[in-house]
Structures are given as C-alpha cells and as structure tokens.
Swiss-Prot record, chain A:
Location relative to the cell: Cellular thylakoid membrane
Organism: Prochlorococcus marinus (strain MIT 9211)
Gene field: atpE
Gene3D superfamilies assigned to the protein according to its UniProt record, in alphabetical order: F1F0 ATP synthase subunit C
Membrane topology: Multi-pass membrane protein
Protein name (database record): ATP synthase subunit c
UniProt xrefs under CDD domains: ATP-synt_Fo_c_ATPH (cd18183)
Keyword Transmembrane belongs to the record: yes
GO cellular component: plasma membrane-derived thylakoid membrane; proton-transporting ATP synthase complex; proton-transporting two-sector ATPase complex, proton-transporting domain
Site (Reversibly protonated during proton transport): E61
Subunit structure of this chain's protein: F-type ATPases have 2 components, F(1) - the catalytic core - and F(0) - the membrane proton channel. F(1) has five subunits: alpha(3), beta(3), gamma(1), delta(1), epsilon(1). F(0) has four main subunits: a(1), b(1), b'(1) and c(10-14). The alpha and beta chains form an alternating ring which encloses part of the gamma chain. F(1) is attached to F(0) by a central stalk formed by the gamma and epsilon chains, while a peripheral stalk is formed by the delta, b and b' chains.
Length: 82, 241
C-alpha cells in the first residue's frame, strides 16, 4: 500500500462520515421540532409521538451509518491496498 | 486486509480479523458461528423452560414469553394485516428475538475474557455476513409471500399505479436487502467501535452512558429490522383494487 493511497483513503473516510452527517442532522432537527410542537399542542399524545420519533430517527441515522460503513471499508478492508 | 491493526492496551479493537475455520472450500468466520450458536441455545433454553409447566396464570418466564408473543403479534398484525399475519408471525418473531438477543449479548456478555487465537467474540450481527444472510432471507420470504398469496398477480405490484414505476420497483428489490443489512451491521459495529475507542481514551466511568446508548440503539435496530421485514411482506401480500 503506497502512501498516496493511504492518504486518500483516510481523507475519504473522514469525508464519508462528515458529509453523510449533514443531511440526517438537518432531518433529525426538523423531525424533533415537529415532535416538540406536537407534544406542546397535545401533551397526552407524548407516548405515541416519542415512539414514532425514535423510529424515524433510526431511519435517518442509518444514512450516516452507510457513510460510516464506507469509511470502515476504506480503513480496514481497503480494496485498493495493493 | 486491515492495514490498521488497532490493538489498544485496554480495548483490543480488531476490525477485519477473524478466527477462520476451513469447511471444504469455504473459509468461515468461526467467532460469529460460536456466538450465534450461543444466542440460539439461550433462546431455545428460554422457550423450553418457559413452556415446560404452563399455567393458567402465567408467572415468571412464561409471563415474559407471553408478553413477547403479544408484542410480536401486534407488530406483525399492524404491518402485515389481519388476513395473513398468522403465517408470518413466527418468522418476524424469530428475526426480532435473534437480532435483539445477539445485539444485547454482544454488548452485555464480557466476551473479551475468552481469548481466541485471532479475532474476538462479539455480537454476531456485527459481522456483515450475518446481516446479509438475514436480509436475503427477508427478500426471499416477501417474494414467497407475494407469490403464494396472489400467484402471478403479485407482479401487478411492479406496475401498480403506473408502468413508469417498473424500473424503480425493480431497483427497490435490490436496495431493500442492501439497506436492511447495512443498517443493522453499521449500527452494531459503530456501537462497538465507539465504546472501544472511548474505553481506550478514558477507561473509567465515561464509557458507561455510551454503553447504555448502545443498548438502546441495539434494541431499536432489532425492532426496525423486524418492522421493515414485516412491512415488506405486508406490501407483497396487500391487495390492490
């Protein structure tokens, strides 16, 4: 494995997680906003809202996790490591 | 493979190192097999103990099993629908319990006390092969559910609102197992990595809340996998009018 491949892989791994975190971050923010508004308007529905919110959080989080999987492949199982 | 042999003094973090067993022409990951056998054995033992002396008023293990049964039935019924959920409840329940016990077993049992020649014991779901196998099982079962319930009319689903949807629905058949397997694998591996890195940086106290967060995420991921499997099956058996 030459040093240029190593450097590129490490930078790409960082970018994969970092850029992948932007979208889900915004999404989770707006989902949480909606949930808080919902609870403020209708406090008795808190249990249901919380369940749905956590489930949708996990879906959004999995987008970042895809980036993480790519990063882990680059770091630990690099297909370009000669 | 694995040009970063991350070996820390406290937390030996070995990604991409396995205990290989040679089985014919196949090289299999032995540590995954051992832990999944333990998980299967634990689940079987629980169920056998819980159903040995059944009483009208459930107590102890029987009570727990009945609670689980109710939970899984509700999950299957809301996603698959009243008509066929009975056929698929065992499958959904097995998926949920296996993934749940695997995830929690990997996090709660101190596997690192058992030393292996290479690799380390951990959650079976932190290995991509396990999750891909489970996801492909889900793919096969929703095809089977659709075909056995509706026959060839199942393929109406691909052109359901308009034929324009056809390519997207075909691509979806490939992305479903991909996202199912990557979601579970990534989440569980990420939990283990975060805990291991934190233990390396601050060996005391600080990793504990992160471990609890990990337990929470693992439980949610098991629920999500089972819910999505049930949803895909429900989508395949749903009648369009």
């Amino acid at each position: 494995m030459d040093s240029i491949t190593t450097a590129a892989s490490v930078v790409a791994a960082g970018l994969a997680v970092g850029l992948g975190a932007i979208g889900p971050g915004i999404g989770q923010g707006s989902a949480a906003q909606g949930a808080v508004e919902g609870i403020a308007r209708q406090p008795e529905a808190e249990g249901k809202i919380r369940g749905t919110l956590l489930l949708s959080f996990a879906f959004m989080e999995s987008l970042t996790i895809y980036g993480l999987v790519v990063a882990l492949v680059l770091l630990f199982a690099n297909p370009f490591a000669g | 493979m694995g040009f970063f042999p991350f070996v820390f003094p406290f937390a030996e973090l070995e990604v991409g190192q396995h205990l290989y067993w040679q089985l014919g022409n196949l090289r299999i990951h032995g540590q995954v097999f051992m832990t999944s056998w333990i998980v299967i054995g634990a689940l079987l033992a629980l169920v056998v103990i819980g159903t040995k002396k059944m009483e009208r008023d459930p107590r102890g293990v029987q009570n727990l099993l009945e609670f689980l049964w109710d939970y899984i039935r509700d999950l299957a019924r809301t996603q698959i629908g009243e008509k066929v959920y009975r056929d698929w409840m065992p499958f959904i329940g097995t998926l949920f319990l296996f993934i749940f016990v695997s995830n929690w077993g990997g996090a709660l049992v101190p596997w690192r006390l058992i030393h292996l020649p290479s690799g380390e014991l951990g959650a079976p779901t932190a290995d991509i092969n396990t999750t891909v196998a489970l996801a492909l099982l889900v793919s096969l079962s929703y095809f089977y559910a659709g075909l056995s319930n509706k026959g060839l009319r199942y393929f109406e689903y691909y052109v359901h609102p308009t034929p324009i949807m056809l390519p997207f629905k075909i691509v979806e058949d490939f992305t479903k197992p991909l996202s199912l397997s990557f979601r579970l694998f990534g989440n569980i591996l990420a939990d283990e990595l975060v805990v291991a890195v934190l233990v390396f940086l601050v060996p005391l106290v600080l990793p504990v809340p992160v471990m609890f967060l990990g337990l929470f995420t693992s439980a949610i991921q098991a629920l999500i996998f089972a819910t999505l499997a049930a949803y895909y099956i429900g989508e395949a058996v749903e009648e369009h009018h």
